[in-house]
Regions:
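Acidic/His metal-coordination segments adjacent to aromatic residues that form catalytic metal sites
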Residues: 108-111, 141-150, 212-235, 298-300, ...
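Trp- and acidic/polar-enriched beta-sheet ligand-binding modules for extracellular glycan
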Residues: 602-603, 629-694
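Disordered, acidic Ser/Thr/Pro-rich linker "stalks" and the adjacent N-terminal cap
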Residues: 540-614, 623-632, 651-660, 690-694
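Catalytic cores of carbohydrate-active enzymes
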Residues: 44-49, 53-66, 70-74, 80-85, ...
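Bacterial Sec-dependent signal peptides at the C-terminal "C-region" and cleavage site
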Residues: 37-44
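Substrate-binding groove/exosite segments of carbohydrate-active enzymes
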Residues: 48, 53-187, 290, 304-321, ...
Length: 694
């Protein structure tokens, strides 16, 4: 065992010396490890059955995912199911803005506090980018970052860590040109946060509501326990960790651009802010990072510490401000304690010992349902942040107050939260005693205010992207785990990384994947590293050009209802429903209806788009929802307007698949309007989730 381990170490070092080409890596393997590879024929390269998996998970909509998402497999079916569900959530929250490209939304339907007319919010953006960076189709993350920085989408509606997310995305794709185009805007936005910087204390402060966490300890106590929706300005671990990470990202991007002065300036800011967080926001008494009050009133006093621990205290680990320093490691005990932050069903945002723990202050006026609060409920938002921080802590050093087995347990607990009565549907917040949703309003279904797939890829599987031509593989599973519910195997396949495809297989005994026992890493299908047991591997990854991002722009998208393009229909003429047919949003979740719905009694219906000017079109995408009273049409035809008449686009007839997007191509046509003529299935109506015309 030791001899073979030593040969593997020599193999890895030899690969590291091999240079920058994939051929050199393969040559190093053959030369450095003859006893490892020559003793017996090499096992075949394992491959997950892509089409079978995607058909099982997504049915008719499998095509959207086929060349986009990395595959995942493990001995835990709940982790598997939630992993694929979260990509479905990602797909549902992609809103096409037409010429501005794609963004990720937080809510599927509209809410009153979103940024109009885009339906964007910036508080969960870092999660959206962290998930989207792992797609082989780089357009979604790229468009979103361009919107945020080049189109003013980062309006500081809430506190944010978007520059840090851009750096995390760069580590995966190494597209320096795209990243550096955003650098001036990153610096500008960072400077705007001076309006929340106390120069005497050297720290940022924020109102909890604008930290996307209303009804926290600071805001409730600042009201004397009477409210907490507004107020409670405080120096918080959240905004200071965000700004630390954003400054570090800007410093690194500036260095990449060769701007040494800016790199040094922001590096100095990083060190100053880190020092102030460690000096001022760490509480020896509470053994935790805490808020200090900015506000001073009859109930609380400036610079005093808040009186209870909150989950937000783990954010210095989430954003790399600290790693495995022993002084702070005891804080992790609080999420393991059932009477502290470790609730039976999930991580509490505040401890039960707090006087106003789980007291309900706010209700929805229309329904009387409970509204959002952060005084104890489980929030997937902060659960994601804490698990990211825990992954960073465990990757930085050996187990201490908390270990790798805890990461797997907490990830599994979080995965279980995605289920409602056996059905996958992540909502806003949950009761930590029961695991049941609290808010439960229509807007809450399939809520994209958190991450999960990044926790699987970079945390559980341990794919740590690097700034150089390498990748660190360090799965967060305990070595020599013999527990009954251990993860006996897992795989991630076709992960885009530095222009290549990275795959990782772990099989405890080699039986499941019928190949190598232990951990194996493949680059573009070739084995580049392995070891017989779990542990860290540093693998060279010679960079390759990324595929060019293709950006077709749908000319049918309508963001403002009163502007062109404008929809009309033969029935179902409610303005909101009509607009949903061309608003750039496509999803097939039945809990939240989306799209134009026919209401006519006859089988033949139509939906038309008036562009208000001549446009040239060559392609269409049609997305039909099926379920309940709705079915995909029996057939359809596309027509275009010419000389005041509707004329057929030839050969465009067929039976589209339900709950999927179908592409239709045709010879270029110049027109001012297009009409979709539908023959409905007997006894059913049609819901057109979206028609896009290119």
């Amino acid at each position: 065992m030791l001899a073979r381990s030593g040969r593997r170490t020599s193999l890895i070092r030899a690969i590291g010396r091999a240079g920058s080409s994939l051929r050199a890596v393969r040559t190093a393997m053959l030369c450095a490890a003859p006893l490892l590879l020559a003793a017996a024929p090499s096992p075949p390269t394992p491959r997950l059955a892509r089409d079978t998996i995607l058909q099982h998970r997504y049915g008719n909509d499998a095509d959207w995912y086929r060349d986009r998402i990395p595959l995942f497999d493990s001995s835990d079916e709940t982790l598997n199911a939630v992993y694929y569900y979260r990509w479905q959530v990602f797909r549902a929250h992609q809103r096409d803005l037409g010429a501005k490209g794609y963004i990720s939304t937080e809510f599927l339907n509209d809410v009153g506090w979103q940024r109009e007319p885009y339906a964007s919010l910036n508080d969960a953006t870092a999660f959206h980018i962290a998930e989207g960076r792992w797609l082989r189709d780089r357009r979604f993350a790229d468009d979103y970052l361009r919107f945020l920085y080049l189109d003013g989408g980062n309006d500081r509606h809430f506190s944010e860590a978007i520059a840090d997310a851009a750096w995390g995305r760069y580590l995966v794709d190494h597209d320096s040109q795209a990243a550096l185009a955003l650098l001036p805007a990153m610096r500008h936005v960072y400077g705007l946060w001076d309006d929340r910087f106390d120069f005497t204390k050297g720290l940022y402060w924020i109102e909890p509501l604008l930290d996307a966490t209303e009804y926290t300890v600071s805001s409730i106590d600042a009201s004397g326990g009477k409210d907490g929706f507004r107020g409670g300005d405080a120096f918080r671990p959240s905004i200071n960790s965000y700004q630390y990470a954003n400054a570090l990202a800007i410093s690194r991007f500036a260095a990449l651009a060769g701007d040494r002065a800016t790199a040094a300036d922001y590096a100095a800011r990083v060190e100053r802010l880190r020092g102030r967080v460690l000096d001022a926001l760490w509480s020896d008494r509470q053994d935790h990072f805490i808020d200090r009050y900015k506000v001073d009133d009859q109930y609380v006093h400036y610079w005093d510490q808040i009186r209870a621990r909150e989950l937000v205290g783990y954010l210095p680990w989430t954003f790399g401000l600290i790693g495995a320093e022993p002084k702070y490691d005891g804080a992790w005990k609080h999420i393991l304690a059932a009477d502290q932050l470790g609730g039976p069903a999930g991580l509490r945002t505040t401890e039960p010992s707090y006087q106003y723990y789980m007291r309900q202050y706010r209700y929805d006026a229309a329904t009387g349902s409970r509204e959002c609060q952060w005084n104890g409920p489980i929030w997937p938002f902060q659960t994601t942040q804490v698990l990211t921080g825990l992954a960073n802590r465990l990757h930085a050093g050996p187990d201490g107050a908390i270990g790798r087995g805890d990461y797997l347990r907490l990830l599994r607990q979080y995965a279980g939260m995605h289920y409602q009565g056996g059905k996958l549907d992540l909502e806003e917040d949950y009761d930590p005693a029961t695991g049941k949703p609290i808010v439960g309003l229509p807007r809450s279904h399939h809520y994209f205010h958190s991450g999960f797939d990044d926790l699987v890829i970079s945390g559980l599987a341990g794919i740590e992207p690097q700034a150089d031509d390498s990748v660190v593989i360090d799965p967060l599973l305990p070595v020599n785990d013999r527990s009954r519910d251990r993860l006996r195997w897992f795989a991630v396949q076709d992960v885009p990384y530095h222009g290549r495809l990275l795959s990782l297989f772990y099989d405890a005994d080699g039986r499941h994947y019928r190949g190598r026992a232990g951990l194996s890493v493949y680059l573009d299908g070739a084995l580049v590293a392995s070891r017989a047991e779990l542990g860290k591997l540093v693998v060279p990854v010679p960079a390759a050009p990324n595929p060019v991002i293709v950006r077709p722009s749908a000319q049918s998208i309508s963001l403002v209802r009163s502007d062109y393009p404008r929809p009309t229909a033969s029935s179902g003429t409610d303005p909101e429903r009509l607009h949903q047919g061309i608003d750039g949003r496509v999803w097939f979740m039945p809990e939240l209806p989306n799209g134009w719905e026919s209401t006519g009694a006859t089988r033949d219906e139509w939906f038309a788009v008036d562009f208000g000017k001549p446009v040239t079109l060559t392609r269409a995408e049609l997305s039909f929802f099926a379920g309940g009273a709705f079915a995909a049409p029996d057939s359809y035809a596309l027509e275009y307007q010419a000389d005041g008449q509707w004329r057929p686009l030839p050969t465009q007839r067929g039976a589209p698949r339900a709950n999927a997007t179908a592409a239709v191509t045709f010879q270029p046509v110049r027109t001012t309007a297009v009409r979709l003529v539908i023959r409905k299935a007997p006894g059913a109506q049609v819901r057109l989730a979206e028609i896009k015309l290119f």
